[in-house]
Structures are given as C-alpha cells and as structure tokens.
C-alpha cells in the first residue's frame, strides 16, 4: 500500500519513545463528486469513516465493522487499498502515552444503509454521516484546526485528513 505522506509528528512527541502502536482503517466513499464523511457537531470537523482495528480482525473485517457502526453500512463493496498515513501522537484518554498510529485508507462503496451503532462518545460529540465536496471538507477542516483542535492527541487528526483529502482530490481529478 502506498504511503500518502511522511509521518505527522505531534509537537512534544519528537524526542519521546513510542509506547504503543495503534492501527486504524478508514473508508474513502466517493459518489457524485462528494465524499461520505463523518461530521462532528462539537468539533465542527469532517473525518473519514472508520476507526480502530481489533485484535484478531483482518483490516477488511475491521473496515466493514467500523462502517456498520458509524454509517449503518449493511453492504460494503469494491474495497480497494488506497494508501496509509502514520502519526506519532499523544493518546486521547491517556495523554502521557505516545502512540504510533497507522491509518489504512480504502476506496469502497456503500449502497445499503441501516441503523448506526455509535459509541457513547460519538453520540456525545454529535457525529453524523454527511456527503460533502472535497474542497468544502478541506476548507471546513482548516477552520476547525484554527478554532477547535488544540487538545493533546487531537492535533494530528485534521492535518492527516486534509493531507488525504488533497491526495484524493488529485486522484479523482476533482
């Protein structure tokens, strides 16, 4: 799988050892010149649907599970590896732990949606799936970086998503 960009390093982790590794899977769902992304009312940002890979799952199983949870996706088809991103960052809940997170991005389609199975924190943050143009997602995420993303562990999320958005904009020639 291609590496989309160099590792993003959260400020303050440069000289610290990596204590844990985390793997995530994320979907690039593109239809009618728009992406299906997950919007957070609290953070006013747009991220690719997906999440953490669990022990014992392969990456495709994890992707399908995450899309069922976040989007209510009943059927995920056309899954094709797109690329990966790495981040060295602080943990979200344990902010003294330094993680190396690898996010694997896959192109896919979802045509059949049912009920979501959101986690409590996703409900609390007001997350919902929305269709949005690539340019609008980039613009809104850049605004969110300036206003909302100053917490340890969150500082690499939107830069990562913006890098991927710009890369897929080129890929789709959008």
Give each language-model segment a name.
Residues 1-26:
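Acidic, metal-coordinating catalytic segment for phosphate/diphosphate chemistry
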Residues 27, 81, 104-106:
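A structural signal for short, well-ordered beta-strand segments
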Residues 30, 34-73:
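Conserved Nudix-box catalytic region and its N-terminal flanking loop in Nudix hydrolases
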Residues 33-35, 43-45, 54, 86-89, ...:
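Short, charged/polar surface micro-motifs in flexible loops or helix N-caps
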Residues 74-84:
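A short coil-to-beta-strand element that immediately follows conserved catalytic motifs
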Residues 88-117, 130:
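Active-site-adjacent beta-strand/loop module that shapes the phosphate/pyrophosphate-binding cleft
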Residues 114-174:
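Nudix hydrolase/Nudix homology domain
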């Amino acid at each position: 799988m291609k590496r989309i960009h160099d590792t993003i390093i959260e400020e303050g982790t440069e000289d610290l050892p990596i204590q844990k590794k985390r793997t995530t899977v994320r979907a690039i769902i593109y239809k009618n010149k728009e992406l299906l992304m997950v919007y957070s009312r609290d953070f006013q940002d747009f991220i690719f649907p997906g999440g953490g890979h669990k022990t014992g799952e392969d990456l495709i199983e994890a992707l399908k599970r995450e899309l069922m949870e976040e989007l209510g996706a009943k059927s995920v088809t056309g899954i094709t590896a797109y690329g990966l991103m790495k981040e060295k960052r602080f943990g979200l809940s344990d902010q003294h732990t330094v993680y190396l997170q690898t996010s694997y991005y896959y192109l896919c389609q979802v045509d059949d949606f049912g009920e979501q199975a959101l986690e409590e924190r996703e409900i609390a943050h007001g997350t919902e799936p929305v269709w949005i143009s690539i340019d609008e997602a980039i613009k809104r995420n850049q605004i969110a970086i300036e206003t909302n993303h100053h917490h340890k562990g969150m500082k690499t999320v939107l830069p990562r998503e913006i890098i991927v958005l710009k890369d897929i904009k080129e890929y789709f020639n959008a």
